[in-house]
UniProtKB/Swiss-Prot annotation:
It comes from the Bacteria. This is Carbamoyl phosphate synthase small chain. Composed of two chains; the small (or glutamine) chain promotes the hydrolysis of glutamine to ammonia, which is used by the large (or ammonia) chain to synthesize carbamoyl phosphate. Tetramer of heterodimers (alpha,beta)4. The active site is at 268 (nucleophile), 352, 354. It comes from Ralstonia nicotianae (strain ATCC BAA-1114 / GMI1000) (Ralstonia solanacearum). GO terms for biological process: 'de novo' pyrimidine nucleobase biosynthetic process; 'de novo' UMP biosynthetic process; glutamine metabolic process; L-arginine biosynthetic process. GO terms for molecular function: ATP binding; carbamoyl-phosphate synthase (glutamine-hydrolyzing) activity; glutaminase activity. It holds the Pfam family GATase. SMART domains: CPSase_sm_chain. Its EC number is 6.3.5.5. CDD domains: GATase1_CPSase (cd01744). Small subunit of the glutamine-dependent carbamoyl phosphate synthetase (CPSase). CPSase catalyzes the formation of carbamoyl phosphate from the ammonia moiety of glutamine, carbonate, and phosphate donated by ATP, constituting the first step of 2 biosynthetic pathways, one leading to arginine and/or urea and the other to pyrimidine nucleotides. The small subunit (glutamine amidotransferase) binds and cleaves glutamine to supply the large subunit with the substrate ammonia. The keyword Lipid biosynthesis does not apply.
């Protein structure tokens, strides 16, 4: 006997309504509706803190084929505001599976909808840009859903880094996962890194630990003085959700690290914060970049790398100072993907070198960070 699901509605702020069925918790959720083109990795996407206050549309038609497990998470909980998919498979099968996707969503109290035309929705978002939306589960009331969608204030001006961040520092030594072994432990660190948690993904911390780093994770609002009290060899600025401009506490701390010539590496929101710290400007993108197949050109050696991306804001390259050299650009739309300072050991990248999900083509940036720390120690 096939399972039966309650009705659900997706409403966009422009009045567009989609009808489907609920595969998660009852109730409603509001946020910015975005689309992600990754074929796999839905569990990592859901638990990525960068998706806070965003309702994620997965464009691949079949989502949930391999279920979920306790290992493939990027945070302690689901951070995405909601989930939108085309089809939920009746049967999920994988040797690592512990629960079905629907069971997981209900347990995490995530409102989710399936059974809608995600191709049509993606075209709307592509042409009109990311929109505020509402998923209403268990109730057939389109006008209520539209009104709720329009009540969401939008992400511009919203400081979410301090919302998703930890409140107390902690140590991290878990390394990357390997088949037959699981996760490893770094017990012979060569470097000490202070990692700012603006919404950090676990796999970033694992890749740092894999490269010989003892990692001290600190809250987003940690001052530069408090961070430097740990006597780190380098500072890492993590990914995270929301608008970078309100994060004045992080911008001020980053300025201090750069002035002191502390090796500093930023990813995603950390990249944007570094851009603001050196005097640049950021802007809200029309649709943002969300996917695991984004081509980026490394301007230093000319190679093309496939990257994982998840951001709705970007740094304006024209606003950067003379000592900031552009290192990477998107081959989709030409937007800035990375820059370095020519007179300081500081650099950053807009995408996600740690992937999870996605390719590890640009994981060499972590090696560059450890090389900068090694040079400073000498």
């Amino acid at each position: 006997m096939l399972p039966s699901f309650p009705p659900a509605i997706l409403a966009l702020a422009d009045g567009t309504v989609f009808r489907g069925y609920s595969i998660g918790a009852a109730g409603h959720t509001i946020g910015e509706v975005v689309f992600n083109t990754a074929i796999t990795g839905y569990q990592e996407i859901l638990t990525d803190p960068s998706y806070s206050r965003q309702i994620v549309t997965l464009t691949y038609p079949h989502i949930g084929n391999v279920g979920v497990n306790r290992e493939d998470v990027e945070a302690t909980k689901v951070h995405a505001a909601g989930l939108i998919i085309k089809d939920l498979p009746i049967l999920a099968s994988n040797f690592r599976q512990e629960h079905s996707l629907s069971h997981y969503l209900k347990g995490e109290k995530v409102v989710a909808i399936a059974g809608i035309d995600t191709r049509k929705l993606t075209r709307i978002l592509r042409e009109k840009g990311a929109q505020n939306g509402c998923v209403l589960a268990g109730e057939d009331n389109p006008q209520k859903a539209i009104d709720l969608a329009r009540s969401f204030p939008g992400l511009s001006g919203m400081d979410l880094a301090k919302v998703v961040s930890v409140t107390q520092p902690y140590e991290w030594n878990q390394t990357e996962w390997a088949l037959g072994r699981g996760y490893g432990v770094q017990d012979k660190p060569q470097f000490h890194v202070v990692a700012y948690d603006f919404g950090v993904k676990y796999n970033i911390l694992r890749m740092l630990a894999e490269r010989g780093c003892r990692v001290t994770v600190v809250p987003a609002q940690t001052s530069a003085a408090d961070a430097l009290a740990y006597n780190p060899d380098g500072v890492f600025l993590s990914n995270g959700p929301g608008d970078p401009q309100p994060c004045d506490y992080a911008i001020a701390a980053t300025k201090d690290f750069i002035e002191r010539r502390i090796p500093t590496f930023g990813i995603c929101l950390g990249h944007q914060i570094m851009g603001l710290a050196v005097g640049g400007k950021t802007l809200k993108m029309k649709t943002g970049h969300h996917g695991a197949n984004h081509p980026v050109k490394d301007l230093q050696d000319g190679r093309v790398i496939i990257t994982s991306q998840n951001h709705g804001f970007a740094v304006d390259p024209e606003s950067l100072p003379a000592n900031a050299r552009v290192t990477h650009v998107s081959l989709f739309d030409g937007t800035l993907q990375g820059f370095e300072l020519t007179d300081r050991p500081a650099f950053c990248f807009q995408g996600h070198p740690e992937a999870s999900p996605g390719p590890h083509d640009i994981g060499y940036l972590f090696d560059r960070f450890t090389a900068a720390m090694a040079e400073r120690k000498q």
